[in-house]
Amino acid sequence: GKRERFLSSGLDEQILALYAQGNSIEDVKRLLHKMLGVDISAGKISQITDKVLPELQEWRTRPLESFYPVIYLDAMHFKVRKDGVYENTAFYSVYSINWSGERDLLGLYINGNEGSNKWGMVLQDLKSRGVQDVLVMCTDDLTGFSEVITQEFPSTVVQKCIVHQMRNSMKYVDEKDRKKVAADLRKVYTSTTEEAARSALAAFGVTWGKKYEYIVQQWESKWDELMAFLDFPEGMRKMIYTTNP
């Protein structure tokens, strides 16, 4: 139908979501450039919003499935000019993947700095639209995030994003070591059993523990949530352990 045609491209969805959050056409133009490096004219943005606006609210509040196998929660950070002052802002996206591997954008939200309480509001929005149960929620490493998920969806498995974790781990690694450190860490999360993954982390510790003790500590302290995907069939694993599907 008409709505599907206009919501068919990811860019249209981003424009509509930003506009729906109360940003002006000029703000939307600036945000798209900042977030995606995309330059799009104010006229084109108006064209998209004018055509779809009557149905936008319907899209934002549309009923969702009661159950999803996997939901990804991710935030992008950028600065927005408000009353002449630049403020840090988080842009939240919520995606699902169904059993056929099809991806669906459930919601886009824009709201101040990222914080676990903001994510609580996002999760409550999903519940108010009919979501009752989620098998796995994939998240970044925000403090308090897991507790918020458990509060709203007590039986959901929390999977911390391996991509985010790798980024954090590699932050202070010397240039000359980067390739080898990344390869050795890859052995941890590509293991097919938890036992093999623990062995790979132990081997990493022997090789690099002295120089990069913080990496070993990071993985050990978050082990259960980083390795949650190992409890699922191999076909599902890669789909689970990253918030960047």
Which role fits each region the language model picked out?
Residues S9-G22:
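Short, amphipathic alpha-helical "recognition" segments used to contact nucleic acids or chromatin
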Residues V136-T143, V148-D184:
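Conserved beta-strand -> loop -> alpha-helix junction used to position metal-binding or nucleic-acid-contacting
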Residues T190-P245:
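Acidic/histidine-rich catalytic cores and adjacent linkers
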Residues L16, M166-M170, P233-Y241:
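A ubiquitous short alpha-helical element
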Residues E26-G37:
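DNA-recognition alpha helix
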